[in-house]
Amino acid sequence: MAENVTSAKATAKMVRVSSRKVRLVLDTIRNKSVAEAFAILKFTPNGAASDVEKVLKSAVANAENNFDLDQASLVVSEAFANEGPTLKRFRPRAKGSASPINKRTSHITVVVAEK
């Protein structure tokens, strides 16, 4: 009943960045090798790139430690970001009114698999 596991997953929840911004970064690394994905993320001038890099690093560590997979043969097979809960705040405005401010969060998931 021993299955041959060829993929590992990592998730970061409640990350304080909009899922729309994270998806732009994830689209650049999907279906790339892990080494190439790290190189892309290192030079991406987007704030979400550092959060995605942390999740990718965690997924690679999970693959190496839990499933004895080789980092050189890993590919980013899945990468997606879902919406997390929105923190709702209010900014005081003129004449006693207030404007809503939505601080959006996201759940980032990265799955790495062997080629």
Curated annotation (Swiss-Prot):
This is Large ribosomal subunit protein uL22. Disulfide bonds: none annotated. Keywords: Ribonucleoprotein, Ribosomal protein, RNA-binding, rRNA-binding. One of its GO terms (cellular component) is cytosolic large ribosomal subunit. One of its GO terms (biological process) is translation. The keyword Ribosomal protein applies. CDD domains: Ribosomal_L22. This protein binds specifically to 23S rRNA; its binding is stimulated by other ribosomal proteins, e.g. L4, L17, and L20. It is important during the early stages of 50S assembly. It makes multiple contacts with different domains of the 23S rRNA in the assembled 50S subunit and ribosome. The globular domain of the protein is located near the polypeptide exit tunnel on the outside of the subunit, while an extended beta-hairpin is found that lines the wall of the exit tunnel in the center of the 70S ribosome. PROSITE patterns: RIBOSOMAL_L22. InterPro entries: Ribosomal_uL22, Ribosomal_uL22_bac/chlpt-type, Ribosomal_uL22_bac/org-type, Ribosomal_uL22_CS, Ribosomal_uL22_sf. Part of the 50S ribosomal subunit. Belongs to the universal ribosomal protein uL22 family. The gene is rplV. The keyword RNA-binding applies. GO terms for molecular function: rRNA binding; structural constituent of ribosome. It comes from Limosilactobacillus fermentum (strain NBRC 3956 / LMG 18251) (Lactobacillus fermentum).
